[in-house]
Regions:
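Sec/Tat signal peptide C-region and signal peptidase I cleavage site
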Residues: 16-17, 31-37
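Short, Lys/Arg-enriched N-terminal segments with co-localized hydrophobic residues
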Residues: 1-17
Length: 185
């Protein structure tokens, strides 16, 4: 039986090479189709450096002269946190006519305009002197310590407090220091 069918001139190695070439062409077209399906875009990265926040002390806190009534168990004096502070004593204390220096502590905060910041005060301030230590519970003229605003890049605030005086507080000058911190929110 003759299976030649007139195709005796076929070179089988050439067909194999053509199949390989055809396969590689399809693979290359597949990659090029993927490259046409891709897209890209660029983005811009930015950073803004703002003015550092800072605080400066303008005035120290001073409760002025206070007298302890000898027949009462001591008491408290509250100093309002304002530019013109008011002192309010409880029954056990009196405020003499010679007031001495009376002022709330004053601070100026500077930083980036329209920024919001936090003021941190201590829970208690200790005053030491010739007798037992006295404690001040501080208060601030800024109603919300966690969201004060630097409207124009500067803000002044005041710190007052409530001073607790013992019944037998020894006469003399008492003093203490306290820290005030500010940070951007």
């Amino acid at each position: 039986m003759n299976l030649d069918h007139g195709c005796s001139n076929i070179n089988y190695p050439e067909i194999t090479q053509m199949k390989k070439l055809y396969f590689l062409t399809l693979v290359a077209l597949g990659f090029s189709a993927n490259s046409f399906a891709q897209s890209f875009v660029t983005a811009t990265s930015t950073a803004t450096i703002i003015t550092p926040i800072s605080i400066a002390k303008n005035l120290d806190m001073n409760f002025g002269n206070i007298a302890v009534n000898p027949t009462t168990p001591g008491g408290t004096v509250t100093l309002s946190a304002s530019a013109s502070p008011v002192r309010t004593p409880t029954v056990g204390l009196t405020l003499p006519a010679v007031t001495g220096l009376v002022q709330a502590a004053s601070f100026t905060v500077t930083g980036e305009g329209s920024s919001v910041y936090t003021i941190t005060l201590p829970n208690s301030i200790s005053l030491t002197g010739p007798g037992a230590a006295m404690a001040i519970t501080p208060n601030c003229s800024v109603s919300t310590l966690t969201s004060a605003a630097l409207t124009s890049g500067t803000q002044v605030f005041y710190v007052g407090g409530t001073l607790t005086v013992a019944a037998v507080q020894v006469a003399g000058a008492y003093s203490g220091t306290f820290s005030v911190n500010v940070n951007y929110n």
